[in-house]
Amino acid sequence: MTLEAFADTIIPGVKRFPGDRAIAGVCDDAGSVEAGALELLADPATGVAPALVPLSQMLNGHATAYAEGAGLTLDDDVPPFVALGYDDRATLIAELTAPGNPERDGWVLLCMFSTMAFDTAAHRSTAEAIADGHPGLIQMGFAEPNSDGLWRFPDYGYGRELAKRHPNTTESGSPE
């Protein structure tokens, strides 16, 4: 729940159900959590999976200290970071990712992977993510692949052909 609240602070989303505490619900569209931030963070390829429990515990410790410093009373029904309101979550994350914070690298990694889950669906096949309606790719207007699952763009990105096709290029786009 703590890492969901963290990811939701980076790219906020709509609450999944009325009593959803992890998702602050500060926007009307799906955010990082619905886009798969937790799946990406837990993927062994990221290298952060073994650190997720310690980072979550540290984040809750920082949330408790932040709340005490701000004179806030936290609800004991949820983890301390989840109990913070969105603005307080964002302020705390800004402090944790500030230059000079000795823990900065860990928090920046969580921010990056939360963003990547939304912006790129890095934990999924892009074609499958689009077919499944991945919220980040859809919101950004990412083009659907052709019927064979490949992307081809008949119009050049800069309005002109940048280079002639190499004579040894195969139909799949690979050199011979």
Would you name each region that the model predicts?
Residues M1-L3, A7-R124:
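Flexible, low-complexity segments enriched for small/polar residues
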Residues G100-E176:
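Long, amphipathic alpha-helical surface segments
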